[in-house]
Amino acid sequence: MFFAVRVERGGPWDWSRDLREQDGFDEHARFMDALVDEGFIVLGGPLEGGREILHAISASSEEDVRTRLAEDNWAQNGMLTVKSVEPWTVLLDGRAD
């Protein structure tokens, strides 16, 4: 099952610094890369303006999505907050098998 997930930056996010210069970036990047490697995060990236991030996630339930994303160090310190998790029926998929 797929979910469209919106995450918002905030809390201790330092808007004067680049993404890769934020506190705890290396740990966050390792965590997110592992979710991609597992096939949990299919696609993801910031939306226009940079405050929100959109992820396409493959998971069994909304609870699974929220539980897994809550393990991120940036979620734990308030830099990222899950704003919405919506079931998504994918009808078009151009990714190669």
Feature-to-residue mapping (PLM):
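Conserved, structured core segments of small domains
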Residues: 1-97
